[in-house]
Amino acid sequence: MASTGLQILGIVLTLLGWVNALVSCALPMWKVTAFIGNSIVVAQMVWEGLWMSCVVQSTGQMQCKVYDSLLALPQDLQAARALCVVTLLIVLLGLLVYLAGAKCTTCVEDRNSKSRLVLISGIIFVISGVLTLIPVCWTAHSIIQDFYNPLVADAQKRELGASLYLGWAASGLLLLGGGLLCCACSSGGTQGPRHYMACYSTSVPHSRGPSEYPTKNYV
């Protein structure tokens, strides 16, 4: 019963992490304008994402433009785009593996095989959490490094956008969800041999010793 609860909690956290990763990948808010120095009086804000950049006016109007070329992106955003797409696909693969091994499905009948599939899905989710963390931390490091670089003009400096925080949340949820699935598999797997030994001990007939047979007097 406890392993079933861990599986449900783990898969729910994983789904939330996947949704956060998808939103983080889609939103053009990886880098936002830093209002410092002369840029304080600027009446517009620049958002930079993985797929497009947007300019938000002080009046609320927003204009977005898709990047013309992948090579025009900075190195950190190029890597982030590739890793985010790979992560989303890996999570979908992990979900398919989990569905094959879930207790509520009949794709696989053997209980040990189901436990192995759940364990594999948990490992896949942990790997996807690490892959989500890499581009987010890389982009954050690049933003902070440029922010404190005196050679970079104030108008070109950026701050951490909302997509980075969503990416960190997605990574944490995927790591936690995958870890719970691995724990559920280990806790559920330890009950199988004990149950088998109990059934085996009750099914084996008890052998009698010579002294236990009733003695009869023969005339």
From Swiss-Prot:
Bilayer-crossing residues are: 8-28, 82-102, 117-137, 164-184
Q: Which UniProt keywords apply?
A: Cell junction, Cell membrane, Membrane, Phosphoprotein, Tight junction, Transmembrane, Transmembrane helix
What's one Pfam family here? PMP22_Claudin
Instruction: List the GO biological process terms.
Output: calcium-independent cell-cell adhesion via plasma membrane cell-adhesion molecules; cell-cell junction organization
Cytoplasmic side stretches? 1-7, 103-116, 185-219
Q: Which GO terms describe its cellular component?
A: apicolateral plasma membrane; bicellular tight junction; membrane; plasma membrane
Q: List the disulfide bonds.
A: none
Kindly state the tissue distribution recorded for this protein.
Answer: Expressed mostly in embryonic tissues.
Instruction: State where the protein is found.
Output: Cell junction, Tight junction; Cell membrane
Q: Which residues carry this modification: Phosphoserine?
A: S201, S203, S207, S211
Q: Which residues lie on this side of the membrane: Extracellular?
A: 29-81, 138-163
| GO function term, MF aspect, one | identical protein binding
Superkingdom per UniProt:
Eukaryota
Q: Looking at the record, which segments are called Interactions with TJP1, TJP2 and TJP3?
A: 218-219
Give the membrane topology. Answer: Multi-pass membrane protein
| Assembly and interaction partners | Directly interacts with TJP1/ZO-1, TJP2/ZO-2 and TJP3/ZO-3. Interacts with CLDN1, CD81 and OCLN.
- What does the similarity note say? Belongs to the claudin family.
Q: What does this protein do?
A: Plays a major role in tight junction-specific obliteration of the intercellular space, through calcium-independent cell-adhesion activity.
Kindly provide the name given to this protein in its UniProt entry. Answer: Claudin-6
Report which gene this protein is encoded by: Cldn6
